[in-house]
A protein has these predicted regions:
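Residue-level marker of regulatory loop/turn positions in helix-turn-helix DNA-binding domains and
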Residues: 144, 148, 163, 180
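Hydrophobic h-region of N-terminal signal peptides that target proteins for export
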Residues: 12-22
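Catalytic Zn2+-binding segment of zinc metalloproteases
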Residues: 149, 154-172
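Propeptide-to-catalytic entry region of secreted or membrane-anchored zinc metalloproteases
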Residues: 23-147, 250-252
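Sec/Tat-exported extracytoplasmic proteins
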Residues: 60, 64-68, 155, 159-163, ...
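Bacterial N-terminal signal peptides that target proteins for export
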Residues: 1-10
């Protein structure tokens, strides 16, 4: 390809990317981060932890903006003036108010106290991510690749998407046709090494837009007040005396 043609093609790509970015709204979310002192010491001090946290949030932002799957540009910004190192039980940090921030992220690489229960997303007015690893007495870095894949998944909850893996149906528990359903490919199904948001996740995140949301409220809000079921014969004519049975499926 001639050099002038190559330059023109590259310029066109840059202009197209800039136009797309300009056409999309930017949603900025302020994040307060706390980490346990033992992890800071194990990782080499505060400056090193700041660097690792910056790298982690670059990956979080990339996950939300990769491939322009969503209608907006997402920017999760750590407030470094509010960044803190805590002592004691990490579970005590989760429910602390953070009125000046959209989200609180509590990291814990040494989860050994019995009160330090499972990590994950805490919604319903708490708006916090408990970013902790295996419950044992050894150090588990919250900055490993799989750990960051996990926190991307938790930010998916923060933006309104429920666990897709919780919707799976085992074949022996499907009384309709006996088929299994394992869920679709998505960060919200199996996040490790995954970059794709499913169509369902994209629609939920887009629906949440720039609001701070609770998953249950968001899901309930998109359902109609009434659902009408029509039953037809093979020739598409309305069936008479049809019986419709609903089989509830509990999540998890």
């Amino acid at each position: 390809m001639p050099m002038n043609t190559l330059r023109t093609a590259l310029l066109a790509l840059v202009v197209a990317a800039a136009f797309r970015a300009a056409a999309q709204p930017v949603y900025t979310f302020r994040v307060k981060v706390g980490i346990d002192r033992e992890s800071v010491d194990s990782l080499g001090g505060r400056d090193r932890v700041v660097q690792l946290t910056e790298d982690m949030f670059r990956r979080v932002n990339r996950a939300f903006n990769y491939g322009a799957q969503l209608r907006a540009v997402y920017d999760f910004v750590v407030d470094w003036d509010a960044f803190y190192i805590y002592d004691g039980v990490s579970a005590d940090q989760i429910r602390k108010p953070h009125p000046d921030h959209d989200y609180l992220v509590v990291m814990d690489g040494y989860k050994s106290d019995p009160r330090e229960t499972g990590g994950g997303w805490y919604g319903d007015g708490i708006q916090a991510i408990y970013h902790s690893r295996t419950h044992n007495d050894r150090f588990n870095s919250p900055f490993e690749k799989n750990a960051i894949d996990g926190i991307i998944h938790e930010f998916g909850h923060a933006r309104g998407v429920p666990d897709i893996y919780a919707m799976k149906v085992d074949a022996d528990k499907n009384p309709v046709n006996g088929q299994a359903f394992s869920g679709v490919r998505c960060i919200m199904n199996y996040p490790y090494g995954e970059e794709l948001w499913s169509d369902y996740a994209v629609r939920m995140i887009n629906h949440a837009a720039d609001r701070n949301v609770d998953i249950d409220d968001l899901v309930a809000g998109v359902l109609p007040d009434r659902i009408r079921v029509e039953v037809a014969d093979a020739d598409a004519s309305p069936a008479k005396g049809a019986v419709v049975r609903f089989h509830p499926r509990r999540r998890y």
